[in-house]
């Protein structure tokens, strides 16, 4: 497995993975409004635009197939984090690579936040995040605000 910054032209593969995992695991618990809101966020053109601004995306690859992705906004917020097959170490490796990328860019590790899907809370807790508030809902998307301290 190799982890690299997403390159121009790879956005379609990234979004295909994101949508496949979302459809299988997260969408069944969302309202129609929530699914539509997420699909609007997880569009190739929107990922391209975010990448030109203050986001970066890392992709875990195996034989030219994406295994997982993590998108970081403003060096302090996890925007998207999806792994095709959980409990194989891909998520942990992606997260560690994202932390190294942040350190490389700013010289230290900022505190991080995430709006975790309900089923992802235990995974984020294993990565050192803690719950900051109860379940929130915005535009049909249910999430738990979580944070992790910096260095």
Predicted regions and their residues:
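A short helix-loop-beta-strand connector motif used in the catalytic cores of GNAT acetyltransferases and
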Residues: 42-58
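Conserved beta-hairpin
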Residues: 54-68, 73
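Conserved acetyl-CoA-binding loop-helix of GNAT-fold acetyltransferases
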Residues: 88-101
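Conserved GNAT acetyl-CoA-binding A-motif
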Residues: 102-119
């Amino acid at each position: 497995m190799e982890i690299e910054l997403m390159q121009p032209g790879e956005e379609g593969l990234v979004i295909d993975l994101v949508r496949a995992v979302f459809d299988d695991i997260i969408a069944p618990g969302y309202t129609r409004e929530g699914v539509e809101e997420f699909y609007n966020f997880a569009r190739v053109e929107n990922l391209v635009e975010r990448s030109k601004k203050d986001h970066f995306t890392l992709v875990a690859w195996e034989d030219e197939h994406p295994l997982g992705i993590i998108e970081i906004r403003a060096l302090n917020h996890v925007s998207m984090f999806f792994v095709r097959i959980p409990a194989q170490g891909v998520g942990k490796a992606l997260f560690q690579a994202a932390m190294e990328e942040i350190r490389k860019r700013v010289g230290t590790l900022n505190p991080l936040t995430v709006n975790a899907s309900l089923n992802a809370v235990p995974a984020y807790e294993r990565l050192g995040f803690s719950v900051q508030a109860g379940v929130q809902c915005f535009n049909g998307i249910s999430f738990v605000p979580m944070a992790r301290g910096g260095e």
